[in-house]
Amino acid sequence: MPTGRFETMREWVYDAISAQRNELLSLFSRYVAQGKGILQSHQLIDEFLKTVKVDGTLEDLNKSPFMKVLQSAEEAIVLPPFVALAIRPRPGVREYVRVNVYELSVDHLTVSEYLRFKEELVNGHANGDYLLELDFEPFNATLPRPTRSSSIGNGVQFLNRHLSSIMFRNKESMEPLLEFLRTHKHDGRPMMLNDRIQNIPILQGALARAEEFLSKLPLATPYSEFEFELQGMGFERGWGDTAQKVSEMVHLLLDILQAPDPSVLETFLGRIPMVFNVVILSPHGYFGQANVLGLPDTGGQVVYILDQVRALENEMLLRIQKQGLEVIPKILIVTRLLPEAKGTTCNQRLERVSGTEHAHILRIPFRTEKGILRKWISRFDVWPYLETFAEDASNEISAELQGVPNLIIGNYSDGNLVASLLASKLGVIQCNIAHALEKTKYPESDIYWRNHEDKYHFSSQFTADLIAMNNADFIITSTYQEIAGSKNNVGQYESHTAFTMPGLYRVVHGIDVFDPKFNIVSPGADMTIYFPYSDKERRLTALHESIEELLFSAEQNDEHVGLLSDQSKPIIFSMARLDRVKNLTGLVECYAKNSKLRELANLVIVGGYIDENQSRDREEMAEIQKMHSLIEQYDLHGEFRWIAAQMNRARNGELYRYIADTKGVFVQPAFYEAFGLTVVESMTCALPTFATCHGGPAEIIENGVSGFHIDPYHPDQVAATLVSFFETCNTNPNHWVKISEGGLKRIYERYTWKKYSERLLTLAGVYAFWKHVSKLERRETRRYLEMFYSLKFRDLANSIPLATDEN
């Protein structure tokens, strides 16, 4: 399939249609007969397969050139007699064509034309020429970026190659590096070079003298014993704690000055002391260390950040020690203070993170002119409070750190927006972590945004996402799929490349997934809690009685309902928030409809409340009702157990292992999952795992080797895959062991917090240097974002009704 000029694509599609006019007329007529609307990629293919079944003469279409077009179509807009196709030949690349079904003619469409055509689904033929169009591409036109889809998510490697090539031009190209080393300070003290070194020749001479001097010292000589001599040559304390460490840094810089190399440059920048104070933003939900998991809007993100902070502090302490500095690092997790804390610590202003020495949770309330909001509110309703929250956070952070942070990390849409406001105000490096971009989780939530506005306020959220992702210095994701999806699925960030919200604005270029700001940095599970079921000496057998109570007790109450009559059967296990996207009710229905699967295994679900009246989350309440309905509709008594959300992480870890003892499996059935922390947890416990193919789990799991991919949009196939697995295990028990061990091997190779923290701090150093060297202050982009924030986001946020403690 051509991927060059748009006109070439138009001609290619036209030629493909011309070759089989009658067959394709039949297919397109079926699309048009469904009336105006949007057909997603799987619907296009499903309709094609139905057409082939009805008319066997269309079988040849399977091998036709047009089939490649159809397989790469992201969506189709049907407005009879037209069908417009968004064709995605590879991740990050889109082209648009429109077919007149009556004439079988083909037109090429620009992004703007395609989106205007799409808007007619909502607006009819209303004139959309004067709708605000957002286009960030001109601001980035001169910046380097890769072009291969395989390079997406490897931004720092590309930057290192680019920086090295610039430095190799001539000695003058090294001046920005010298300036960076001379101006780099902490608390007013120079970290690398002092005023004795004014230019590159002086630096090279000083490095040569230092190299000779250090070569005569024992490798383990403490820095304090030769500090005065090095300072006299122009070097300050940040080069290392021993003669060996300082010598390694000197050699790295000499190599860079002689012949810049990308890997050497990254190693050198990663060892420069840059990050001492970190601020992490996560405003929504109940952010605490105990009794919070399972509360509304409180789940994997809290676990992720707490594990991240512990690993990050360990790495910061290790690096500071190796750098020969006497600096105490500080990490602040900034979240919302909740006076109505529901028995948690969320009403405490400052709380030390357990397992750390210098990391704290700093809580700041949401407030308005009427005072402090005391109760929890949904993450979808926080937008009117964030600007004031950011101002208050700025003051509180300055007081706690007695200065400004070196790095600000945002989490989710609200945290990333606050991070953007703070980073712009303080002039600090900003890192974004999306966790989940709601636009991907709720299909067609952009074009039909008005239908969701009262409940979800997506207009504010999508606007905040665009501002934050364009303001960030670098973005880390857990998987490639989060950025650019896969061959058949669009990535979370990729979905923000071009979209429209009719009547509000049209995004013709929102984000470029080829931007070198994107980096894949995968987290792990806390291996003090999650470890293999076979590690008998570490097993928490004291918890087995309470676990068996959860699983098998005959008592029906607010913590568990349902019975498992045959306790000898293996258990299909799933644990998640109880919302539509996590699709726990979909798994229950999938299980309930397959008699063979019910015969082979029991089903245990952990999530949400049992009693609808205990929930305050709108979506969760609907799922609770659906779960109870499914139990009765399919008479699941005796084969199904529903357990309310569990907040004890240690017991949850042992629960995974207990399920493994039954030779059971873990299933993650979400319609979309950005990463899949529970997938990593279950695999770390060596529990065979089946997880959605939509999102990150498809990347974590090697299908058939370290687990299995499932498609929740085809529940019959999910059930068949599970049946096949259990039947194979019944005849060959080693099959269960093989998948169990394959999952564990995958975790050890790719998903640990140690590797994560090392990478994150290295990225912070490289992007700080890149921002300095390129003079990338992005004034034009910032002004554009400020205008967009002031003229669009602020009005959208302020249109959301403020919550009251009475209602």
From Swiss-Prot:
GO BP terms: namely: response to hypoxia; seed maturation; starch metabolic process; sucrose metabolic process
| One GO cellular component term noted in the UniProt record for this chain | plant-type cell wall
Tissue specificity, please?
Answer: Detected in the whole plant but at lower levels. Predominantly expressed in developing siliques. Also detected in the root tip. Detected in the embryo, endosperm and seed coat (at the protein level).
Q: Which Pfam families match?
A: Glycos_transf_1, GT-B_Sucrose_synth, SUS_EPBD, SUS_N
The cellular location(s) given in this protein's UniProt record come to: Cytoplasm; Plastid membrane
- Please state the span of the N-terminal signal peptide per the UniProt entry: none
Q: Which domain of life is it from?
A: Eukaryota
**Which keywords does this chain's UniProt record carry?**
Cytoplasm, Glycosyltransferase, Membrane, Plastid, Stress response, Transferase
Q: What is the enzyme's class at the highest EC level?
A: transferase
Q: How does it sit in the membrane?
A: Peripheral membrane protein
Q: What induces it?
A: By anaerobic stress and by glucose. Positively regulated by the NF-Y/HAP transcription factor complex at least composed of NFYB9/LEC1 or NFYB6/L1L and NFYC2/HAP5B in association with DPBF2/BZIP67. Positively regulated by LEC2.
Q: Which PANTHER family match?
A: PTHR45839, SUCROSE SYNTHASE 2
- Its name, as the record gives it, is Sucrose synthase 2
